[in-house]
Amino acid sequence: MAQYEAVIGLEVHVELKTRSKIFCDSTTEFGGDPNTHVCPVCLGLPGVLPVVNKKVVEYAIRAALALNCQIAGFSKFDRKNYYYPDMPKNYQISQYDLPIARNGYIEIDVNGKRKRIGITRLHMEEDTGKLVHQGTITTTPFSLVDYNRAGVPLIEIVSEPDLRSPEEARQYMEKLRAVIQYTGVSDCKMEEGSLRCDANVSVRPAGSIAFGTKTEIKNLNSFKALQRALAYEIERQIDVLEEGGRVVQETRTWDEGKGITLPMRTKEEAHDYRYFPDPDLVPLVIDREWVEDIRRSLPELPDEKRERYMREYALPAYDAGVLTSTRELAGFFEACVQGYPNPKIVSNWIMGDLLRLLNAGNIEIQDCPVKPGQLVSMLRLIEKGTISGKIAKTVFEEMFATGRDAEDIVKEKGLVQISDEGAIAAIVDQVIAGNPRTVEDYRSGKEKALGFLVGQVMKATRGKANPELVNRLLKEKI
């Protein structure tokens, strides 16, 4: 079997978080009743004219700068002509040959090394309406159209074909989402459609420089779907080639239930859309000083914050990467460190117990029932010896479930750590007397035996004995 490599490029659509749409003043609010957030402009009624929302241009420049793009001094809007029920004008206002930004990049970690993924272009366009299918897209007897989304401002970010695996594609998407979220121009919620992705993928013999025939995959509404769809499509294309067939250039949809891609239509080329400049919109002349003002207003971005955490807090690269993966998580961490200046301990609790509980409950960090001040208070109890680290885990789960403070839970449940040496010594004596064989094992050099004896003492005290004191007394008495 010949060895193949995948060649992947992503087209990512990001809805911008402006109050009004790109060419009219209809609201962009998510979740209204169908066809209530519309006006004659976004419905494409005769006699209306679009007017560019300046905030959209600002947000596009802001995102482009964060992605290391070069901003155009001159840009324009074009009509992309096609016929589809979710497009009321029968054309989409987009940008073709003069996008607002080009030649950017972001970096991802691949096998412990930084890999730069090129960004071909970033351009502005209006979103389409939304088709609501009765059933799946391939089985529905009819579809309904909701135009609330029509005219919502988008930026499309087109990557170079620099990705070589589904895992790299997922990393790229996660990093792209983080960068955009940090800028504040979008919430990037895939479940609400404010971050969407189409994937172009082909395969070629390993070592070849020629591209294979690509397919485009749509309906990728999660990182998991992106990774699974690419893995399936790569395998499908290799199977076609191995059997002597020919990969067809087409658009395919991802069927999450069946775990397969299905053909939708033949893949269009640029000339199929008959692009031409929109005669109702004047070209954009971008003032350089305005661009520099926007650049100066950018916040600390994920890579910069990650490097600072490693330098300032002495965190490992992995910890720093996880903690800076979202702006909200980084904010939670920094709020904790302000109150409890031991970054590694804070990092361990956030990356361990906190993220585990958040993931299990499918809860975002901004909705976390445990606030930074509450976590700090619990860490202070451990530091003072009021509770042990083991008991703290039980306390933290109760805090997460109820939102209550650690002090109240410890007091109510009687979880204060036993640090009375005499009381612990008596229990240690009982454990030593009851486990003579284990005691002899420890005396003969078996270190693990001590762990068993410590466990027996902790069991007898329901986990409340001071573990350092238990260890010392056992060693002294044995």
Swiss-Prot record:
PROSITE patterns: GATB (PS01234)
Enzyme class, UniProt record, top EC level: ligase
Listed Pfam families: GatB_N, GatB_Yqey
EC number: 6.3.5.-
Keywords: ATP-binding, Ligase, Nucleotide-binding, Protein biosynthesis
Known catalytic reactions: L-glutamyl-tRNA(Gln) + L-glutamine + ATP + H2O = L-glutaminyl-tRNA(Gln) + L-glutamate + ADP + phosphate + H(+); L-aspartyl-tRNA(Asn) + L-glutamine + ATP + H2O = L-asparaginyl-tRNA(Asn) + L-glutamate + ADP + phosphate + 2 H(+)
One Gene Ontology term from the biological process aspect of the record: translation
One annotated GO molecular function: asparaginyl-tRNA synthase (glutamine-hydrolyzing) activity
Assembly description: Heterotrimer of A, B and C subunits.
Function text: Allows the formation of correctly charged Asn-tRNA(Asn) or Gln-tRNA(Gln) through the transamidation of misacylated Asp-tRNA(Asn) or Glu-tRNA(Gln) in organisms which lack either or both of asparaginyl-tRNA or glutaminyl-tRNA synthetases. The reaction takes place in the presence of glutamine and ATP through an activated phospho-Asp-tRNA(Asn) or phospho-Glu-tRNA(Gln).
Family classification: Belongs to the GatB/GatE family. GatB subfamily.
Protein name: Aspartyl/glutamyl-tRNA(Asn/Gln) amidotransferase subunit B
Organism: Pelotomaculum thermopropionicum (strain DSM 13744 / JCM 10971 / SI)
